Amino acid sequence: RWDGKGYPSGLKGNDIPLFSRIICVVDAYEAMTADRPYRSKLTQEYAISEIIKYSGSQFDPEIAKIFVEKVLKANWQ
């Protein structure tokens, strides 16, 4: 987690490796937008709103912004 409350090391902010920060956002998006045995997939709009909502606490705010604006929205057009 970007805010340092993550397991196991409690790394915070830029101390978290860049690749890990990217995977955190991508994994969360995939988990929300894929069907699971215990629930149906959530909408892309909802997943984006959750990524934005938790930007700065769970997610690196810059990575979250780039993922939403450059990756997701660019692919919708």
Region roles according to the model:
Residues 1-77:
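Metal-dependent catalytic cores of enzymes that make or break cyclic nucleotides
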